[in-house]
Swiss-Prot record:
Function: Subunit of the oligosaccharyl transferase (OST) complex that catalyzes the initial transfer of a defined glycan (Glc(3)Man(9)GlcNAc(2) in eukaryotes) from the lipid carrier dolichol-pyrophosphate to an asparagine residue within an Asn-X-Ser/Thr consensus motif in nascent polypeptide chains, the first step in protein N-glycosylation. N-glycosylation occurs cotranslationally and the complex associates with the Sec61 complex at the channel-forming translocon complex that mediates protein translocation across the endoplasmic reticulum (ER). All subunits are required for a maximal enzyme activity.
Residue ranges annotated as Cytoplasmic topological domain: 448-456
Pathway(s) the chain acts in: Protein modification; protein glycosylation
Residues passing through the membrane, by range: 428-447
Organism: Homo sapiens
Domain of life: Eukaryota
Entry's family note: Belongs to the DDOST 48 kDa subunit family.
Name of the protein: Dolichyl-diphosphooligosaccharide--protein glycosyltransferase 48 kDa subunit
Length: 456
């Protein structure tokens, strides 16, 4: 106690001022750390790029430059780098993962198929580009996501839709834009030139409803060894041949698989394209760049991201929600839905958003109408009491799953709220009153009627 008393007396009795040299050092340290703090706050999405070799950074520079121009912070490493790590102390070190290393046989460091799957389960975005020299890790990762790659050294072959510069194996495919998924949020809104593709084919797991067939082969395409005669049924044939596939998991994590690493290359971006068939139109440039940018915007959640804003509900004519609604109340429900556009949240424009009023099953299902930046609707509560939910469950192709649920209680009418006379019971009322009236008349007649006396 004596030491504590002396310490307090010393601290309160004499207040020492900070020496000028100490204050100067503190201010100097603050100004030195300020730019670093600003840089950390302003950094874009952290993206790890795994390459077979660092030369890929030069051969695919246009694609990487498009990411940097949009603010992405790219970290380039070879796929077998022993220092690789996605997770540290239970936290993800990166927001996105790009795998441009199709021939990798073993990832370096702490990265493997299990950690990549955990990264996806945690909401991370992954872009994978394969080739005919595909290794087992990418094949296993595809299986985890409902995608099955063909064997190593196979390629997609199309004897009717190959480019004029093909070397004779008909593996340089010209994919028509009609084979693209009809989802502008994923593939872009602008019309594209034909797509140039050279790589391995894929097929989707028919039992996985989350797989998206982004770009398919034509009806004449198939996947096989280009330098061997066909002795067995090919792994993928016709429209079932996937060139680019996608996946949006139930936690809104997104993954894209491309069977062609060349699809993202500068040479394919800048190449002219023309089918070898006589009379085919020649295009000065492929549509690869525009499609690659659109796919990257979607997979890295720059497009198609929705969120729920303020939600309100109340009786019509009031402004605040009650503690409990009463059956057959006329209520108004409104919700704000926003969409991420160019890094900013803007009102979402949709005409197919539905509201459900659910107990166990929906009792009311109605469309929400846009009004003044929010979606609202008025409806009458059912004549059923219990615990209900205002539920908006919006799940559309290319958009993140939007879900909002608000629980409310609906009670029956109070004793004083019931009608005195129910119209459907009027016949019974008439029967009761007529019987009362009849009894009254009978009583009067019976009491006042005097029998005649018998004469002797």
């Amino acid at each position: 106690m004596g030491y504590f008393r002396c310490a307090r007396a010393g601290s309160f009795g004499r207040r020492r001022k900070m020496e000028p040299s100490t204050a100067a050092r503190a201010w100097a340290l603050f100004w030195l750390l300020l730019p670093l703090l600003g840089a950390v706050c302003a950094s874009g999405p952290r993206t790890l790029v795994l390459l077979d070799n660092l030369n890929v950074r030069e051969t695919h520079s246009l694609f990487f430059r498009s990411l940097k121009d949009r603010g992405f912070e790219l970290t380039f490493k070879t796929a077998d780098d022993p220092s690789l790590s996605l997770i540290k102390y239970g936290e993800f070190l990166y927001d996105n993962l790009i795998i441009f290393s199709p021939s990798v046989e073993d990832f370096g460091g702490n990265i493997n198929v299990e950690t990549i799957s955990a990264f996806i389960d945690g909401g991370g975005s992954v872009l994978v580009a394969a080739s005919s020299d595909i290794g087992d890790p990418l094949r296993e990762l595809g299986s985890e996501c409902g995608i099955e790659f063909d064997e190593e050294k196979t390629a997609v072959i199309d004897h009717h839709n190959y480019d004029i510069s093909d070397l004779g194996q008909h593996t340089l495919i010209v994919a028509d834009t009609e084979n693209l998924l009809k989802a502008p949020t994923i593939v872009g809104k602008s019309s594209l030139n034909p797509i140039l593709f050279r790589g391995v084919g894929m097929v989707a797991d028919p039992d996985n409803p989350l797989v998206l067939d982004i770009l398919t082969g034509s009806s004449t395409s198939y996947s096989f060894f280009p330098d061997k005669p066909i002795t067995q049924y090919p792994h993928a044939v016709g429209k079932n041949t996937l060139l680019i596939a996608g996946l949006q998991a139930r936690n809104n994590a997104r993954v894209i698989f491309s069977g062609s690493l060349d699809f993202f290359s500068d040479s394919f971006f800048n190449s002219a394209v023309q089918k070898a068939a006589p009379g085919s139109q020649r295009y000065s440039q492929t549509g690869n760049y525009e499609l690659a940018v659109a796919l990257s915007r979607w997979v890295f959640k720059e497009e198609g991201v929705l969120r729920v804003g303020p939600v309100s509900h109340h009786r019509v004519g009031e402004t605040a929600p009650p503690n409990a609604y009463t059956v057959t109340d006329l209520v108004e429900y409104s919700i704000v839905i926003q969409q991420l556009s160019n890094g900013k949240w803007v009102p979402f424009d949709g005409d197919d958003i539905q509201l459900e009023f659910v107990r166990i099953d929906p009792f009311v299902r109605t469309f929400l109408k846009k009004k003044g930046g929010k979606y609202s609707v008025q409806f009458k509560l059912p004549d059923v009491y219990g615990v209900f939910q205002f539920k908006v469950d919006y799940n559309r192709l290319g958009y993140t799953h939007l879900y909002s649920s608000t629980q409310v209680s609906v009670r029956p009418l109070q004793h004083t709220q019931y009608e005195r006379f129910i119209p459907s019971a009027y016949p019974y009322y008439a029967s009761a009153f007529s019987m009362m009236l009849g009894l009254f008349i009978f009583s009067i007649v019976f009491l006042h009627m005097k029998e005649k006396e018998k004469s002797d």
